[in-house]
Amino acid sequence: MSDKATIYDIAKKLNISAATVSRALNDHPKTSNKTKILVQETALELGYEQNKLALALKSGRSNTIGVIVPRIDINFFGSIIRGIEDELYPKGYHIIICQTHDNEQKEIQNINALLNAQVDGIITSITKNTKDVSIFERILDKNTPLIFVDRKLNLKGASSVTLDDFKGAYQATQHLIDQGCKRITHLTVIGYQSVGIYKDRLEGYTQALKDNDIPFDADLILDIENDINGGKKAGQKILNFKDRPDGNFFFE
């Protein structure tokens, strides 16, 4: 196997300096377009590939953003990734996608890997088990922008993009009450009750009941697994109620 082409090979072929080749490859404003095109064509001909990590270390930018989600096979997170990429790609950025599978240790490993890759920013949705905030503080200490999506931590210096889950749950429950419903089930996911968005939804549901003088019934809170079988079990449980519910508040 032949050695990889270098900027010196390009320089030798074009009879110019390696410094000129480097400036052309990095789109230096003082390099003519004619030289840039010539260098790029020769680089392609010789099979030259830039060392992106070395370039990132030199320039301080990698033009990559790390995106961490619990699972990419969940439609909600898939749509988030698609939206992020649609916004970043036209601006010259690429994304590195990581999954945690709601495992805090894997979350830490992902963050360390992204920081080592010199990403220009990290967008993340925390795991249901996230307790140690020090890894996120490390991101901020390195002056790497941090954005939480959907699930978040309240950290100074970090940004977040979330929905008002309390209001959404309240309005959904109120709508059912306005339709005459009084026994309304609420589904929540096993192991996620401490995650902010799920707590907010339960509180919104509970507040709507309270505001309409409907007593809270713990039996109507259904804890399910976060998969299709969990949904099937919930449906069967609803059908098996002796005093069957007349309204159901679900979410994906």
Kindly label every feature range from the protein language model.
Residues 45, 86-91, 112-115, 140-148, ...:
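Bacterial carbohydrate/catabolite-sensing allosteric modules
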